[in-house]
Regions:
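Substrate-binding/active-site groove segments that recognize
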Residues: 71-93
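Short, functionally critical alpha-helical segments immediately adjacent to catalytic or ligand/cofactor-binding
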Residues: 52-69, 109-110
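Alpha-helix initiation and capping sites
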Residues: 38, 55, 99-103
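Second-shell loop/turn segments in exported
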Residues: 26-35, 43-50, 88-99, 167-170
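N-terminal export signals and maturation junctions of secreted/periplasmic proteins
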Residues: 1-46
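Short, well-ordered alpha-helical packing segments
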Residues: 41-48, 62, 103-113
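Non-catalytic cell-wall polysaccharide-engagement segments
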Residues: 1-18, 92-237
Length: 237
């Protein structure tokens, strides 16, 4: 799916972010990921100074694509011992030679995506660039990308279980970028966009979110929850 125009979907990102509530059962996982990003803040800041990309944007990409730790290609999580094998394939090109340093890879990844040319960042643009990194294919299925929203109320079910293979009932088991980012903002109050706080005010009950059409995945999720509750009740009686 081709990339949508940012200006046409930025408002929807703002609404999703403002209405996002992290699932209590997954809050600890999001906090752990955020602390892992903060553990390497100095490395992200060093690359930020050379690229003008905010350190927390670099950290988020590293966590989502490579599991954090500044130890794999920022492009896609491939090993730094050789050029990238997965898309984008063949990075870094000659005259650079492997093994590569993490800063080398990070600066190349940010440059080929044009992130070093961005003049003004916002939480909406962060959402857009993170979704672009993973792909906009979820939009064709009418759901919010789990890459962004998993572990929050903005995602329920549906995912690609392998390249091009879609399942309406599969549920992502990975924390989404935005729940992690919310934890990161809570732990590091210096994070802001052009001096404005990154985190929204606490949403009121029934905060407006993207319309969510009931899917088979939703029904399966609800049935599983009911079965789980019944089993617990049966064991207790």
């Amino acid at each position: 799916m081709s990339a949508p125009v940012f200006s046409k979907i930025s408002d929807s990102y703002a609404k999703l972010w403002a209405g996002m509530v992290v699932a209590p059962a997954h809050q600890a996982a999001c906090d752990r990921a955020a602390r892992a990003i903060l553990a390497y803040k100095n490395q992200y800041v060093a690359v930020s100074k050379e690229t003008s990309v905010p350190w927390f944007v670099i950290g988020m990409i590293d966590m989502m694509e490579a599991g954090g730790g500044c130890r794999r290609h920022l492009h896609n999580g491939d090993s730094l011992l050789h050029r990238t094998v997965n898309v984008p394939r063949g990075r870094l090109p000659a005259p650079a030679e492997p093994p590569f340093t993490w800063p080398q890879s990070a600066k190349d990844a940010l440059a080929i995506d044009g992130l070093d040319k961005v003049k003004s960042w916002s939480v909406e643009l962060l959402c857009y660039e993170m979704e672009k990194y993973n792909g906009f294919g979820y939009r064709a299925h009418g759901i919010n990308s789990p890459y962004l929203w998993s572990y929050s109320n903005q995602y329920h079910a549906g995912k690609f279980v392998s390249d091009g293979v879609w399942s309406a009932t599969a549920v992502s088991g990975q924390a989404g970028a935005m729940p992690i980012f919310k934890s990161l903002c809570t732990l590091d109050k210096t994070i802001s966009f052009d001096g404005k706080p990154a985190t929204p005010a606490t949403p009121a009950p029934h905060a407006a979110t993207e319309p969510h059409e009931l899917t088979l995945g939703d029904l399966v999720h609800d049935v599983e929850a009911l079965v789980s509750s019944f089993v617990k009740w049966a064991k207790a009686t």
